[in-house]
Swiss-Prot record:
GO cellular component terms given for this protein: plasma membrane
Active-site positions on this chain: 376
Organism of this sequence: Shigella boydii serotype 4 (strain Sb227)
Needed cofactors: heme; Mg(2+)
Catalytic activity: 2 GTP = 3',3'-c-di-GMP + 2 diphosphate
Gene name tied to this protein: dosC
Protein's name in the database: Diguanylate cyclase DosC
Residues under site feature: Transition state stabilizer: 338
EC assignment: 2.7.7.65
Length: 460
């Protein structure tokens, strides 16, 4: 890649050097005068494509992209020799963002085609001479083509790396502590079954019961299991069983009086037992040949390391956009960890990190993700958790750690606490923006005295 970018730098530099300075000046003049119009027209046309609309529907994104597009047009069409290296780096950065968000390369290529199409009438309606118009157009199109090639090559490299990490995560997820995960999910669906059966037999209110897709097992399957076992037939079978039973469940909830009829009640109970039994059988088959493997896991805390953060965020953001369900993130910092570590030593510091990590595991659902983000910093991705649920989870974790007892080697008690920043997904497709605003909330929590939870709001 390094040799390729050097070659493209030489080519772009050659284009600029060989162009008549007057033509370059006129291309820059066109760019400055018409960048705003070109940007608006560009996004108007691109958004007609329903696939592109998926990535541009967020108002904040559209506003930021339009101004960024204006700057990009001016930079590329006004390039001087000394600008070329910086411009190549800009294309690389833009490509990384596209890959991180998951924008398909065909949309990027369509965008360049649209830009060249709308640039043509702008240049040829100017008051330049016919020869000047042709030369300005030639210089502008060649500049855009070089920028496009650099961006596409960088995008392909970034996207390929991301795809490789997606597959690595899938394999890691399959292998990581499989036996324990299997038993946990079997226990989860059995617990859901027992809860409903007891309520029916005791003639209790079923209103608080959840359909299978919204129970803990259903959330785990939709957010993790479906991805873990991607491409395996049993996944489709389980999906259909959940979907079919949800239909039966919802119909029953609309008229619970039918359960007073013994034959209908027995039929419903047998449908529950049959569905759960089939799902457990399929789950055992899926997990049968899976064994433990810890690549991608933080050795000390047994949490995910940040390697798989892009893979998970990309998938969960796509799910949230597709289904309209909430998504949130917590960024967590151990208060005064460096001071504790320096005072009591690394062994004590490691023990604190292990205890804190256990508190995370004990207070999140199996559909959530917990990462060790840095030394004493952690990220939790909460799937389908409302703002209130997000804050309750954060407060539960904070309270649990505050009550954790830890003694130093000399018997002295060590006080532990966490500062937590929370943020709700607002439609912006770049997960780094979600992390950024959660980090801003974390900063507020620290500034307001630590040992507290703060939710990011635009007014913060």
């Amino acid at each position: 890649m390094e040799m390729y970018f050097k070659r493209m730098k030489d080519e772009w530099t050659g284009l600029v050097e060989q162009a008549d300075p007057l033509i370059r000046a006129k291309a820059a003049e066109i760019a400055v005068a018409h960048a705003h119009y070109l940007s608006i027209e560009f996004y108007r046309i691109v958004r007609i494509d329903p696939h592109a609309e998926e990535f541009l529907s967020n108002e904040q994104v559209e506003r930021q992209l339009k101004s960024a597009m204006e700057r990009w047009i001016i930079n590329v069409l006004s390039a001087q020799v000394d600008d070329v290296e910086r411009l190549i780096q800009i294309q690389h950065t833009v490509a990384e963002v596209h890959a991180r968000i998951g924008i398909p390369v065909e949309i990027v290529e369509m965008g360049f085609r649209v830009l060249k199409k709308i640039l043509y009438p702008v240049i040829f309606s100017s008051d330049y001479s016919a020869a000047e118009k042709l030369q300005v157009y030639h210089f502008s199109i060649n500049s855009i083509d070089i920028a496009m090639e650099v961006m596409t090559r960088a995008f392909t490299f970034s996207d390929s790396s991301a795809s490789k990490e997606d597959e690595n995560y899938r394999i890691f997820s399959l292998l990581e502590n499989a036996e324990e995960e299997k038993e946990r999910q079997i226990a989860s669906i059995l617990s859901w079954e027992i809860d409903i059966i007891y309520k029916i037999l005791l003639d209790s209110d079923l209103g608080s019961s959840l359909p299978l897709s919204q129970a803990d097992f259903g959330l785990w399957f939709n957010h993790k299991g479906r991805h873990y076992f991607s491409g395996i037939a049993e996944v489709g079978h389980i999906s259909r069983l959940i979907q079919d039973f949800d239909g039966i469940f919802n119909q029953t909830m609309r008229n619970t009086r039918n359960l007073n009829n013994r034959s209908l009640r027995v039929k419903f109970l047998l449908q529950i037992r049959n569905t759960v039994s089939q799902i457990i059988t399929l789950l055992r088959e899926l997990f049968e040949e899976v064994s433990r493997h810890e690549v991608g896991m933080d050795v000390l805390t047994k949490l995910l390391n940040r390697r798989f953060l892009p893979t998970i965020f990309k998938r969960e953001i796509a799910h949230a956009n597709r289904t309209g369900t909430p998504l949130s993130v917590l960024i967590i910092d151990v208060d005064k960890f460096k001071e504790i570590n320096d005072t009591w030593g690394h062994n004590t510091g490691d023990e604190i990190l292990r205890k804190v990590s256990q508190a995370f595991y004990d207070n999140v659902r199996s559909s959530d993700y917990v990462f060790r983000y840095g030394g004493d910093e952690f990220i939790i991705v909460l799937t389908e958790a409302s703002e209130n649920e997000t804050l309750r989870t954060a407060e539960r974790i904070r309270s649990r750690v505050e009550k954790t007892k830890l003694k130093a080697a000399n018997g002295e008690d060590i006080a532990l606490s966490l500062s937590i920043g929370a943020a709700m997904f607002n439609g912006h497709p770049d997960y780094e923006r979600l992390i950024q605003i959660a980090d801003e909330a974390l900063y507020i929590a620290k500034r307001r005295g630590r040992n507290r939870v703060e939710l990011w709001k635009a007014s913060l």
